[in-house]
A protein has these predicted regions:
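Periplasmic/extracellular loop-to-transmembrane helix junction in inner-membrane transport proteins
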Residues: 1-10, 38-44, 71-118, 265-282
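N-terminal signal-anchor/first transmembrane alpha helix
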Residues: 2-69
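C-terminal transmembrane helix and the adjacent membrane-cytosol boundary/short C-terminal tail
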Residues: 21-33, 177-180, 226, 230-234, ...
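Hydrophobic positions within alpha-helical transmembrane segments of bacterial inner-membrane proteins
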Residues: 63, 111-134, 138, 153-156, ...
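Non-cytoplasmic
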Residues: 160-161, 165-187, 231-263
Length: 308
């Protein structure tokens, strides 16, 4: 009975720690932010402030990984699969590299690549969607049909096929995933912009002689930002998971560079011996994904204008 209840005990402890982190982050933000923003944060749910704290921690790790990591990313230090000890707090991996250092550099590589990919996908998809909705006609039809064809192909299969053809370098990985996700951003941007271009203030701007880019930049984009910002967070989650999945399958970030998805595969044999080390990179992937979703959910709630 005690063995069965142990996981529930750990889950309760984890939830309590998350609540404390969320409350502490909210209290700190209320103190440092201007009064107007502090009022908004004061009423934020603990899930949102917990997500902010987690995202901030990941950003610090990404920016300061070489300073935080006790050892180098690729240095073989000792025997493989050493248990947790004072020298190696999380043991060593399948080649004898420090697991803690690999996790830190894995966060830097995975999050950095995912962010760059999301920015590229968002720029391509949002610009295409805004142009298609604003100009309409043959351009809208052409871009929409191209997106329909790309979205008809399962994204993971498309990525596997393209990476097998082009090679598994980081630029190719970023390009392929960006193409896959730009189609989703295009759909959202086009749908949002299509509802805005028929508004009276947009027609008035056209009658005043506003050019295409001025029309998009001054009239359409500011009113389309809330859903697009939320979509950016969601796209980052999907890109982050896609890159981790491809690395797990061997077509993402290549050794000896650290990547969270690849680290799960490399140390999977430890699960046979009841070692939780392979779970750590998977837990880091899940934690960031959940944190970003918490913040995006709160941002959508704010932009919708709904009241508690």
């Amino acid at each position: 009975m005690t063995t069965l209840l142990l996981p529930f005990g750990w889950a309760i402890v984890a939830l309590a720690c998350a609540a404390v982190v969320g409350w502490s982050c909210r209290a700190a933000l209320v103190l440092v932010l201007p009064a107007r923003n502090a009022r908004t944060v004061r009423h934020a749910p603990l899930t949102a402030t917990f997500g902010m704290a987690v995202i901030a921690a990941y950003v610090i790790v990404v920016l300061a990984a070489p300073l935080i990591a006790p050892h180098g990313e690729r240095i073989v230090l000792d025997a493989e699969y050493l248990p947790w000890n004072s020298t190696y707090p999380l043991g060593t991996d399948n080649l004898g590299r420090d697991m803690l250092s690999r996790l830190i550099f894995g966060i830097r590589n995975s999050v950095g690549i995912a962010f760059a990919t999301t920015v590229l996908a968002f720029l391509a998809g949002a610009i295409g969607g805004l142009l298609a909705a604003t100009i309409g006609g043959w351009l809208d039809q052409l871009l929409s049909r191209i997106v329909d064809v790309l979205m008809a192909i399962p994204s993971l299969i498309f990525a596997l096929l393209m990476l097998s053809i082009l090679g598994t370098s980081i630029p190719n990985l970023i390009l392929v995933i960006a193409i896959v996700d730009a189609t989703r951003v295009f759909r959202i941007a086009r749908a949002v912009a299509a509802n805005i271009v028929v508004m009276e203030y947009v027609e008035s701007a056209r009658l005043r002689g506003a050019g295409l880019w001025r029309l998009i930049g001054r009239e359409i984009l500011p009113n389309a930002m809330p859903p697009l910002v939320a979509e950016f967070g969601l796209r980052f989650c999907f890109v982050f998971l896609s890159i981790s999945a491809l690395s797990f399958l061997g077509l993402g970030v290549q050794p000896p560079s650290a990547d969270l998805g690849a680290m799960v595969r490399e140390n999977a044999s430890l699960i046979t011996f009841g070692d939780i080390t392979p779970i750590l990179p998977a837990a880091l992937i899940a934690l960031l994904t959940v944190a970003v979703n918490f913040v995006v959910d709160w941002a959508l709630h704010l932009s919708s204008g709904l009241k508690e």
